[in-house]
Amino acid sequence: MKPVIALVGRPNVGKSTLFNRLTKSRDAIVADFAGLTRDRHYGQGRQGKHEYIVIDTGGFEPDASSGIFKEMARQTQQAVAEADVVVFVVDARLGMSAQDHDIAKYLRRLGKPCVLVANKAEGMKEGVQLTEFYELGLGDVLPVSAAHGQGVRDLLDLALGQLNLPEPEEDDPFDDVAQKPIRLTVAGRPNVGKSTLINTWLGEERLVAFDMPGTTRDAISVPFERAGQKFELIDTAGLRRKGRVFEAIEKFSVVKTLQAIESANVVLLLIDATQGVTDQDAHIAGYVLESGRAVVLAVNKWDAVDDYQRQMLERSIETRLSFLKFAPMHFISAEKRQGLGPLWNSIIQAHKAATCKMPTPVLTRLLMEAVQFQTPKKTGIYRPKMRYAHQGGMNPPVIVIHGNSLEHVTEAYKRFLEGRFRKEFNLVGTPLRIELKTSHNPFADKDK
């Protein structure tokens, strides 16, 4: 599982700027979840081989007792509880405050790994103006400038170094997956019906479930079998033990959702027909796409809406989730057990598509046929020339195309190629990534 880093500190010390640096973005992939918009933002980043999740929090006053400040304190405490390491941000220019002392006292009491960061330290003599922060009792002070990117790499080295992370395993992209269980995550916002659907499945299959071994950061996974196909159901709804089996309860955790999506082979994205497509649905869908996971859409509570509402909902899905056009969509009622059979078929089909093997001769033939049908547009004196294609990975499938001047290939032409490949290999329910590798000889592709 990806380690989780929480940024805490009093208001206006530069946490959000640092967050944007750590995620290399001005808007995290998963941000502004409903009910958390002013308090917690979630994003992801990478340092070398290690990926991580970052939580940005509102200004923290541990002892706040009323109003918005109490809610912000509660949200920050939740972020700290979710985190593996805390980055405590102070303002190097304004110096230490009573609030900093209160936050440090709270963090010392928790005993969680912590990195003390003095932001806005650009142009300051190192060590001279930061001495007072040693009084906080959290060890060395790391000067950084989030605005200029100074010290950010050192910050990540310190934060991740405290966790003794193992080297990420190099997965064989062509490992035989036929005999492995399909890892399935049911994702969706709170009260969309995840727990009802999971409990329906568990009840149907009369499962004996158990915790899989792993670290405390691991999501619970429940192994089960259906029609001869083995699955592992990865928890996002909050599975609790009931005797020798699990039942699901509604318990929404952004971090758990992100980690469960990362751990999955296939994500079943559940949408509430009575609520329509919300911003939160779109954010989760965006994270699924960015993670490269196979995905199936299921619109739950379909029996609770009339024909007009159904038409409007279908249009909304086509518009707001247009980037998931490749995903099969089902209309179900988890409570009444309607539409669940075809849903299983699509889950298996999506996994098959995500892990299919595409021979180089077939890919190259398809590429040549596509080029013959529609030649890439010429840009200036250069025209992209495509030579051959091969598979570069699975789950999601990656097709690598080699040639000359491929940097001039338009996004529209890439979509054209994607459509041809999808049709040939029946790639339903999975993202498809196309990588272009061009010759570095600037004269190789000039039109004479």
From Swiss-Prot:
Which Pfam families does this UniProt record tie to the protein? KH_dom-like (PF14714), MMR_HSR1 (PF01926)
Q: Which residues form a coiled coil?
A: none
Write out the residues that bind GTP 1. 9-16, 56-60, 119-122
GO MF terms listed in the record are: GTP binding; ribosome binding
List each copy of the EngA-type G domain by range: 3-167, 182-355
Keyword check for Endoplasmic reticulum, yes or no.
no
Annotated GO biological process: ribosome biogenesis
Q: Which domain of life is it from?
A: Bacteria
Keywords recorded for this protein, A-Z: GTP-binding, Nucleotide-binding, Repeat, Ribosome biogenesis
Q: Which residues bind GTP 2?
A: 188-195, 235-239, 300-303
Keyword GTP-binding applies: yes
Disulphide linkage map? none
Q: Which InterPro entries match?
A: G_ENGA, GTP-bd, GTPase_Der, KH_dom-like, KH_dom-like_a/b, P-loop_NTPase, Small_GTP-bd
Q: Subunit notes for this chain?
A: Associates with the 50S ribosomal subunit.
The family this protein is said to belong to: Belongs to the TRAFAC class TrmE-Era-EngA-EngB-Septin-like GTPase superfamily. EngA (Der) GTPase family.
User: PANTHER family recorded for this chain?
Assistant: GTPASE DER
The UniProt function text for this chain reads:
GTPase that plays an essential role in the late steps of ribosome biogenesis.
- UniProt-listed NCBIfam families: GTPase_EngA, small_GTP
State the protein's name: GTPase Der
What is the organism field in this record? Delftia acidovorans (strain DSM 14801 / SPH-1)
Q: What is the lineage of its organism?
A: Bacteria, Pseudomonadati, Pseudomonadota, Betaproteobacteria, Burkholderiales
User: What is the name of the gene encoding this protein?
Assistant: der
